A protein has these predicted regions:
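Cleavable N-terminal export/targeting peptides
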Residues: 1-31, 240, 255
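Transmembrane beta-strand segments of Gram-negative outer membrane beta-barrel proteins
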Residues: 27-42, 64-69, 193-195
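Membrane-embedded beta-strand positions of outer-membrane beta-barrel proteins
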Residues: 36-38, 69-71, 105, 125, ...
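Membrane-embedded beta-strands of outer-membrane beta-barrel proteins
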Residues: 36-38, 54-56, 89-91, 125, ...
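Transmembrane beta-strands of outer-membrane beta-barrel pores
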Residues: 40-44, 62-64, 73-77, 109-113, ...
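Solvent-exposed loop/turn segments connecting transmembrane beta-strands
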Residues: 42-50, 78-84, 111-118, 173, ...
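Repeated loop/turn-to-beta-strand initiation elements of outer-membrane beta-barrel proteins
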Residues: 64-68, 100-103, 135-139, 187-193, ...
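Outer-membrane beta-barrel "beta-signal"
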Residues: 124, 214-217, 243-255
Length: 255
């Protein structure tokens, strides 16, 4: 499947800015809103597998504050052997300083059994800017500093794709610079294109993740989403690849 190419082609075929009347209403203040999703994943990179994934994203707006929470995971087996397993969680709080400028603080943790890192955890803080902030189009960028701690591990994969041996290395930590960008475009009243980029760079590793998705509503609460995600670690253990990609098809429930 080539979901990433499909999404890019669809995005190029529509106007950059949709009419404001086509955009969904803004979320209410003081109430947790969000979405849960589950579906199918095709993974390539350190593991080539077909697996299932789940994710929960929630957000709360209270005056100048916005809090966002993420929890996700994927799991797959091949011939009775675990061939994909990843769990991650993140929290970010933004505080508006002006109509366009905000301060942020965030925490992130990932446990991936096939990435070459037993875990990666970071805390970051900095400033962001809302480039577009309408109901139809939202684009923001942020830059900051923080601390990244990770624990490398050397893996040997067996013929079925499972891990046959695992050797933990000492944990490492370093100061990091971080850059992120978040984009959302309502293409119509039922279709939304979104993209989220994160870069964390330090002496131990540079992590780059990007999540591109196209969601189409099939009812008031349900949507079908196709996505293309990448994760690149520039300094993985010698036996492992730098780049992992995920192609996803999910059923999404909004609340």
């Amino acid at each position: 499947m080539k979901f990433g190419r499909w999404i890019l082609c669809i995005a190029a075929a529509v106007p950059l800015l949709a009419a404001a009347d086509d955009a969904p209403p803004p979320p209410p203040e003081g109430v947790w809103t969000g979405k849960g999703q589950a579906g199918y994943v095709s993974s390539k990179g350190n593991t080539d597998s077909k697996s299932a994934n789940v994710a929960l994203d929630m957000a709360l707006i209270e005056g100048p504050w916005k809090h966002a929470f993420h929890l996700g995971g994927l799991y797959g087996q091949s011939a009775g052997v675990v061939s994909a397993e990843r769990w991650d969680t993140a929290w970010q709080s933004n505080h508006d300083l002006t109509a366009n400028v905000f301060a942020f603080g965030g925490l992130r943790y990932q446990h991936d059994m096939f990435s070459g890192f037993q875990y990666q955890a970071s805390g970051t803080a900095g400033l962001g800017y809302k480039i577009f902030d309408t109901n139809a189009t939202k684009l923001s960028a942020q830059i900051g500093v923080g601390y990244l701690r990770l624990r490398p591990e050397d893996l040997t994969l067996g013929p079925s794709g499972g891990v046959s041996s695992r050797t933990l290395e000492p944990a490492e930590g370093s100061a990091v610079g971080t850059f992120g960008a978040t984009y959302s475009q309502a293409l119509s009243s039922t279709t939304t294109l979104s993209d989220k980029l994160l870069v964390e760079s330090g002496s131990t590793d540079t992590l780059i993740t990007n999540a591109l998705a196209l969601a189409v509503k099939i009812s008031t609460k349900l949507a079908l989403s196709v996505g293309y995600n990448i994760q690149d670690n520039t300094k993985p253990p010698a036996s492992l690849k730098k780049l992992d990609t995920l192609e996803t098809v999910n059923l999404v429930y909004s609340f």
